[in-house]
Amino acid sequence: MTLFRLTTCASFLFLAACKDAALAPCLIQRPPLGGYTMKFTLPGAAPAGCENLMPPIFGDNWRIDGYSDHQIYMKSDLMHYPQDGGDPDPSHSVLGKGILPDEPTNGICTIPDVTEMRSDTDPLGTGQAEFAYHAHGMNFLSGARYQGSEFEAKVDVTIGSCTATYSVQALTPTQIGGTCVTDADCDPFADPAAGRPLGSGINPDYAVACTMEDWVTTYLTGDPTVGICFFTKPFPGLK
């Protein structure tokens, strides 16, 4: 039995219709949308002695899926499976697991805690092999109009012997690899006359723009001339 039920009012990729529909169950958006693109921000300074290891801001993409009994599994694109060149240590799991509630509270569905994801492969190029995530307080924006298409969270990031708690904001459909060069590319609706046969797929309620900040071009696009469509406001990031 799956946790994920499409509503009959879904007419766009971002499922952004039917404002007046009955209370929707807790949902997350599954891997076919490419996962959630995430901005990790370190509030304040890094722990003493960790300034050169913990980036102030960085980006990643997590694939999230759900199974029976409200179980939610997630995996970072930075962490490869052992058979794909990842960490061969069987005691280190690249999969995190949490529990999604049945119904939202005040429009939010919260996964309180996620098991550690770890891959000792230095994915950020810091020179330190140990790398781990421990997410907690994952708050998904719920309701028939949003259906878990964004979340905020706190994530304990471990690099080498250093650990710091980052604030995270995340958006789906994925923006990995780059999706824009101008703000017009972030329009959720297609405009064939302007050379955009497809829209961005992002919920039209979200305040987004094309950003080419360093955390984007360094960690997500690899190109200073290509950006991603991302929030311009803190969670819930609505217009």
Please state what every model-predicted region is.
Residues M1-T7:
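Bacterial N-terminal signal peptides that target proteins for export
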Residues K19-K239:
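Mature soluble binding/inhibitory domains
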Residues T8-F12:
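Sec-dependent N-terminal signal peptides
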Residues L15-A17:
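C-terminal motif of bacterial Sec signal peptides marking the signal peptidase cleavage site
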